[in-house]
Amino acid sequence: RLILCKKSILVEGDSDELVVQRAYMDTHEGRLPIQDGIDVMTVGGVTFKRYLEIAQTLNKETAVVTDNDGNIESVKKKYKEYEEIQCIHICVDEVVDTGDLKLSDKDFNYNTLEPKILKENGREAMNNIFGTNYSTDDEMHKYMRTHKTDCAIAIFESATKIKYPEYIMRAIKNE
């Protein structure tokens, strides 16, 4: 797929793929990325680098959409060797968000796709899209965390457009 496409956007998971595809549609008159020769591929966090090696060899325009997981320096270090490669673009949120929510006595990670979408759009908008009625952001965070795919499908299929995190917009506009 990487060889055949005009450009690729590499994402971590299925939910990310659906959201990136919808963001593209919302900014490209309803066209799916593939209609413009752009393949959005779920490759998982550990295989990004192998795809980037191939993209570099082929000089293929490639964007990586990845979470910062609360450690931007770690992401920068991981992809440092691709900083100067013109055809490769690492798209990561430059902001580390924190909060008080705990899940099973562990700190909630506010630095993944779902919390970033909630931050951009607010609880009311997300309640409308998901058909839920949560009264706190923490409740919405828990719901989105445990229903990642359902939430991504709801966003993808919604008649309502949402706001997308800046790092996703960077990936789809980098043409």
Q: Locations of the language-model features?
A:
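Acidic, divalent-metal-binding catalytic cores of TOPRIM
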Residues: R1-E175
